[in-house]
Amino acid sequence: MVRPRRAPYRSGAGGPLGGRGRPPRPLVVRAVRSRSWPASPRGPQPPRIRARSAPPMEGARVFGALGPIGPSSPGLTLGGLAVSEHRLSNKLLAWSGVLEWQEKRRPYSDSTAKLKRTLPCQAYVNQGENLETDQWPQKLIMQLIPQQLLTTLGPLFRNSQLAQFHFTNRDCDSLKGLCRIMGNGFAGCMLFPHISPCEVRVLMLLYSSKKKIFMGLIPYDQSGFVSAIRQVITTRKQAVGPGGVNSGPVQIVNNKFLAWSGVMEWQEPRPEPNSRSKRWLPSHVYVNQGEILRTEQWPRKLYMQLIPQQLLTTLVPLFRNSRLVQFHFTKDLETLKSLCRIMDNGFAGCVHFSYKASCEIRVLMLLYSSEKKIFIGLIPHDQGNFVNGIRRVIANQQQVLQRNLEQEQQQRGMGG
């Protein structure tokens, strides 16, 4: 482990962490959850933080506010955690190494190419804390993620250990580029390699363009955070088109956050008897802020069967106990208009998940509101009973269609 030592006091305007000629106010910590780690019978234990007798923690103020991190924010805020002014004086060096990340090249170059950046960096903790970093790798690999995709991780962010990151100002272009990217709404996710024996698996890096500081958050619930961040990264990849270029502003719709992207396929009846046409649309599923919908196991294509709503009245109790999500369809306007017309005329969509898929969801229902012009998905909590109920509904529908067909044939025969 790197022996803790006092960080040099920096003043003046030099560097992104420099002050402005006056010492910052002393700061305190409040509204932080307990720093004790819950006992875990399995898996690696969370990072150990030894608290010694010391003055109250300085350098961090934690508020309960929630807001965006950006050039206009008074501090770092994400998921209810806000980090205000910091200074490196009275902090102890916990780790030294190199941070590596990739950023897009300038617009005039190949948009699919990435530029690798590296900077020497150090992590500092407050006096009285000891972050076990002796097993940390000498190089940390960081992935940049839009902050808007991380709001669902608020509870995990609030229960985190803070460490301040400082970059040695040897490469001004790299440092300015990192400040510019993170100041425009990106956060850094550092995933530690599994071959590393340290107990930390993931660390988040945030930046305040106003305070000129980088703050690292080490979630205490490492396993829960790793699972959640993997879903975020998967969702990000699904929302990005070929070559890593965004297919459009589909991450947020009406303050909802993207949970899944793929294709919806269904069949529509045609004017000819017993004839159907196959239709499909690119689709996206959104959830409310603060909610997590685990979609990493969802298939890329969902198959929907159109059912008359009048046949679903027996399933109303199961509908009431459902989770709501919002569907958004893009591209083919004529196909979308046709789907809206059919569902507005009394049909609902039953989306079946393939049994090959390992996700827990087996079926969800899609409804359309012509008044609000939105598609709502209902995911019943009682999947087993709902699957059995919907099977009975589909069987009844087939019987009704068969009877109607027989009656039409009889009427034609009598008319002849």
Curated annotation (Swiss-Prot):
Gene Ontology biological process: positive regulation of transcription by RNA polymerase II
Signal peptide limits: none
Record bears the keyword Magnesium: no
Principal place of residence: cytoplasm
Tissues showing expression: Expressed in brain, heart, kidney, liver, placenta, skeletal muscle and small intestine.
Stretches with biased composition (Low complexity): 27-36
Residues where Phosphoserine is found: 53
Top-rank taxon: Eukaryota
Keywords carried by this UniProt record: Activator, Cell membrane, Cytoplasm, Membrane, Nucleus, Phosphoprotein, Transcription, Transcription regulation, Ubl conjugation
Induction: By testosterone.
UniProt region (Disordered), positions on chain: 1-53
Composition bias type Gly residues, residue spans: 12-21
The record's account of how the chain is modified after translation: Ubiquitinated by the CRL2(KLHDC2) complex, which recognizes the diglycine (Gly-Gly) at the C-terminus, leading to its degradation. Ubiquitinated by the CRL2(APPBP2) complex, which recognizes the Arg-Xaa-Xaa-Gly sequence at the C-terminus, leading to its degradation.
GO CC terms of this entry: nucleoplasm; perinuclear region of cytoplasm; plasma membrane; transcription regulator complex
Region (Interaction with FLOT1): 184-416
Function: May activate transcription. Required for nuclear translocation of FLOT1. Promotes cell proliferation.
Similarity section: Belongs to the Mediator complex subunit 25 family. PTOV1 subfamily.
PANTHER family for the chain: MEDIATOR OF RNA POLYMERASE II TRANSCRIPTION SUBUNIT 25 (PTHR12433:SF11)
Assembly with partners or alone: May interact with CREBBP. Interacts with FLOT1.
Protein name: Prostate tumor-overexpressed gene 1 protein
